[in-house]
């Protein structure tokens, strides 16, 4: 009993340590994507489609294996069928004579081996092509999940920036309110101006609280996308200044042929050609080898211990199968897949043109968003300098609170422009990664 308790305590302590080890995660964007692909159940479920298609390849290849089967037939005839015996065999007159044994048993082994059947080889090629197609579909599903995780990760960075700016605004209005309170006590400020400053500070606190709430929601969404527990503390190691978001790292030349949509259409076209080949080969004859070895027991009962009544026999042969009317059906199937092939060619050309334009457009949007973010960031930094200057003027009494509010409009506009530019940049980076086939 003590041993069992000790084992349970050890297991609990190990589990607790494991939980503690996974409750804190430092994640870059790429690490978050890798973790999500590892943890998500839909990714794991999709991988079983690959196992199914791999099994189909093995099933097609096994068509070449010989078919070996055993059979048994035990028959008892209470009354044997009579056979007419002509005159001269058993007497001067014809007679009905029952020939044979009442008990007949035959046990044998049959072997059938395909020697020539062109369709099997093509079936294996089709199965392998379908596996490659399923791999590309699985990749497309993973790219969709990568995009969701990346959007969730970048949304946290955006909400973090909004929270920081809201906190800066709150601190700024707090300083205005503190100065106004001091002036009110000195009698150099009317009460209404003080109340305005206090109200603006309270409103700024509300905005900060809302920004923090949005940040927590964004973090919860990221945890959901990478499938970790809600109690896990995530620390994002990438930020807007990280090399991962630099213009040089994002400006990767895109190629439409790298997109899985193009690869799927190419594989679909290969499948069309293989189907045409398969139906053409259906018109060719099939050749098979067969053999049998059996032992027969004949007697009046089923006493198999009487070895003298056992007798073996065997045979071998070749079987030819030549389709005749099936060729009329094959013609319709061949025509259908020729039409599908033409259709796939056109879809491939259009999809290539679509993706080429998508890459070009996403590249321009990313370049513009990068420039706009840098410009608005400079304006945002300039607004901080303006704030320091006006704070000194307000402290010295050379600037009224109404003048402070006029300046705050410009400051708030700079902040909102910067946040919007960051949002556009993050969205453009996602769209570009998607366009070149990374997501």
PLM feature spans:
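Bacterial Sec-pathway N-terminal export signals of envelope proteins
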Residues: 18-69, 73, 79, 230, ...
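Periplasmic alpha-helical coiled-coil/stalk elements that build and connect Gram-negative outer-membrane
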Residues: 27, 55, 138, 144-256, ...
């Amino acid at each position: 009993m003590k041993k069992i308790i000790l084992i349970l305590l050890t297991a609990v302590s190990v589990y607790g340590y494991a939980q503690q080890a996974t409750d804190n995660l430092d994640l870059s964007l790429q690490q978050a994507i890798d973790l999500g692909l590892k943890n998500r159940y839909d990714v794991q479920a999709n991988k079983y489609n690959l196992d199914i298609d791999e099994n189909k390849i093995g099933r097609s290849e096994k068509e070449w294996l010989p078919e070996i089967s055993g059979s048994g037939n035990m028959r008892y005839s209470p009354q044997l069928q009579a056979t007419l015996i002509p005159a001269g065999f058993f007497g001067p007159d014809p007679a009905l004579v029952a020939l044979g044994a009442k008990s007949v048993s035959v046990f044998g082994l049959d072997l059938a081996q395909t020697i020539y059947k062109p369709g099997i080889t093509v079936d294996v090629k089709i199965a392998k092509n379908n596996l490659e197609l399923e791999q590309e579909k699985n990749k497309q599903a993973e790219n969709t999940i990568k995009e969701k995780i990346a959007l969730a990760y970048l949304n946290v960075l955006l909400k973090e920036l909004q929270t920081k700016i809201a906190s800066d605004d709150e601190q700024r209005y707090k300083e205005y309110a503190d100065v106004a309170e001091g002036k009110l006590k000195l009698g150099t400020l009317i009460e209404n101006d003080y109340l305005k400053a206090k109200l603006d500070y309270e409103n700024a606190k509300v905005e900060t609280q809302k920004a923090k709430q949005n940040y927590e929601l964004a973090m919860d969404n990221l945890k959901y996308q990478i499938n970790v527990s809600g109690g896990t503390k995530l620390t994002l190691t990438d930020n807007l200044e990280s090399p991962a978001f630099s213009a040089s790292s994002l400006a990767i030349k895109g190629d439409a042929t790298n997109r899985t949509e193009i690869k799927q259409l190419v594989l679909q076209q290969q499948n069309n050609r293989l189907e045409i080949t398969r139906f053409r080969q259906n018109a060719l004859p099939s050749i098979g080898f067969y053999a049998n070895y059996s032992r027969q027991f004949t007697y009046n009962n089923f006493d198999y211990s009487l070895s003298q009544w056992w007798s073996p026999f065997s045979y071998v042969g070749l079987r030819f199968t030549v389709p005749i009317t099936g060729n009329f059906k094959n013609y319709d199937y061949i025509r259908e897949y020729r039409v599908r092939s033409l259709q796939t060619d056109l879809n491939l050309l259009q999809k290539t043109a679509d993706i080429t334009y998508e890459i070009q457009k996403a590249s321009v949007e990313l370049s513009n968003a990068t420039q706009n973010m840098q410009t608005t960031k400079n304006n945002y930094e300039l607004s901080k300098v303006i704030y320091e200057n006006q704070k000194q003027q307000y402290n010295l009494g050379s600037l009224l609170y109404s003048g402070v509010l006029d300046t705050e409009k410009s400051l708030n506009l700079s902040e909102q422009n910067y946040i919007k530019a960051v949002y556009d940049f993050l969205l453009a980076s996602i769209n570009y990664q998607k366009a070149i086939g990374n997501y």
